[in-house]
Amino acid sequence: IVSYPDDAGEHAHKMG
């Protein structure tokens, strides 16, 4: 799973 900052930079989304 790779976590990356969202467009707004508020939270980190997890994508795997």
Swiss-Prot record:
The modification Glycine amide is found at residue 16. One of its GO terms (biological process) is defense response. Keywords: Amidation, Amphibian defense peptide, Secreted. It is found in: Secreted. Expressed by the skin glands. One of its GO terms (cellular component) is extracellular region. Coiled coil: none annotated. Has no antimicrobial activity. Does not inhibit the formation of NO by neuronal nitric oxide synthase. This is Riparin-5.1.
